[in-house]
Amino acid sequence: MDLIIASRMDEASMLMAEKIIDLYDFNRLNENEYQKDGFKLMFIDDLHIYHNMEKLDFDTLIFLSRHSSSAGVKSLTVHSIGNYRKAELGGYDNKTVLSAPYEMSSSLRSIKELYNDDGYNITFEATHHGPYTKNRSYFIEIGTSGEDWHNDKILEIMARSVIEKNVKRFRSGIGIGGGHYAPKISDYFFNNDINIGHIIPKYVSETIKDNQIIESIENTENCSFILIDWKGSPSRLRSLALDAADKCSLELIKI
């Protein structure tokens, strides 16, 4: 069973949760919990990025969330959880958590299939922020304003991409390089039968340590490759990726 988590401090999170409950007729267990088939939905009072948790008896945790963009870019995104530097938005410094490459990638693939317009950027984001969990987990987000969060068509797409996603067990790997939205990694993903877990962006290239890349590999289930945006990776990050691929006997895919 998977656990869907909605924060009462996040309007988009609440709206997505309400759409899931209504669309799939979830059964109310109590004021904070609903359930249907292989999913439980839980409301929390604090902001999800700060809601650290010990190991829970669920397969995957799915956090519903708003997405913020200083540029106002309309986006539908998914991303793994953790920090490659100081934890300014939840979690722990320099620590990633277990990603969910099969489920997260399948949610993004579902969004892409269901949304056939040009109004939103559909993409991975690099691994960032909290909370710290001991379960496989990922965020699914709507950005970037109230207009987007209240868009009924978008809410239905996101709900369906959580509940109805067709989980494909393609081989999984991590991404390295590029900006926060990892455009080349996302494009390659949509055109190849792969799944992605953690993504390490170029903006951490000067401070990331080799053990953090190894941890990202270990926290990506059945990781078999590193997908690297070669031109979008400074020389230090390229070198660390090459070393990690060699140490962990992974295929290095340059794009």
Swiss-Prot record:
Its EC number is 3.1.1.96. Binds 2 Zn(2+) ions per subunit. Its cofactor is Zn(2+). One of its GO terms (molecular function) is D-aminoacyl-tRNA deacylase activity. It holds the Pfam family tRNA_deacylase. The keyword Hydrolase applies. Keywords: Hydrolase, Metal-binding, Zinc. It catalyses: a D-aminoacyl-tRNA + H2O = a tRNA + a D-alpha-amino acid + H(+); glycyl-tRNA(Ala) + H2O = tRNA(Ala) + glycine + H(+). Coiled coil: none annotated. One of its GO terms (biological process) is D-amino acid catabolic process. InterPro entries: Deacylase_DtdA_archaea, DtdA. NCBIfam families: PRK03995.1-4. D-aminoacyl-tRNA deacylase with broad substrate specificity. By recycling D-aminoacyl-tRNA to D-amino acids and free tRNA molecules, this enzyme counteracts the toxicity associated with the formation of D-aminoacyl-tRNA entities in vivo. Belongs to the DtdA deacylase family. PANTHER family: D-AMINOACYL-TRNA DEACYLASE. This is D-aminoacyl-tRNA deacylase.
